[in-house]
A protein has these predicted regions:
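Non-catalytic, surface beta->alpha helical segment in thiol-disulfide oxidoreductase systems
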Residues: 112-133
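Structural microenvironment flanking redox-active thiols in thiol-disulfide oxidoreductases
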Residues: 1-58
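Flexible domain-boundary/linker segments
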Residues: 27, 74-75, 125-126
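Sec/Tat-exported extracytoplasmic proteins
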Residues: 3, 61-65, 132
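Thiol/selenol-based redox catalytic cores and closely related redox-interacting motifs
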Residues: 32, 38-118
């Protein structure tokens, strides 16, 4: 865990909208995340993050921080290429583009940042450290 629970909270919202990467039950997904990523924070029920059935939380998060790009890393170039074929309009919508998109919300409830799955976790950690200062 990056931070103690009194400093920051992290939540996992499994979603099967991205290449069918989370087809299992909530229990199976939790076991996978615990074994593969050593997650030690709450996992919510599998949910939609885009579309007609998306959780209202994600409607709000995306309205606060829309998509700003993937950056220029090799992973970003791969993501851009994949989405250019499967979703040519991907740049023009606030939709979540792929699993592991992260939103940082400060203590006052403001969305401080959106990090795409291509973002370096060091950047996420740096922002959270600044916010919990």
């Amino acid at each position: 865990m990056l931070f103690s629970s009194d400093e920051a909270l992290s939540f996992i919202f499994p979603c099967n909208q991205f290449g069918g990467q989370a087809p299992g039950s909530d229990a199976e997904i939790q076991e996978f995340c615990t074994l593969k990523y050593n997650t030690q924070f709450p996992q919510m029920k599998k949910s939609d993050v885009n579309g007609a059935n998306e959780l209202p939380l994600f409607t709000w998060l995306k309205a606060q921080k829309g998509f700003e790009g993937f950056g220029s890393s090799p992973a970003a170039l791969m993501m851009k290429g994949m989405l250019a074929v499967s979703r040519p309009d991907y740049k023009s919508t606030p939709d979540i583009k792929w699993n592991f998109t992260k939103f940082v919300v400060d203590r006052a409830g403001n969305v401080a940042a959106r990090f795409e799955p291509t973002a370096d976790m060091k950047d996420v950690r740096k922002l959270v450290e600044k916010l919990i200062g």
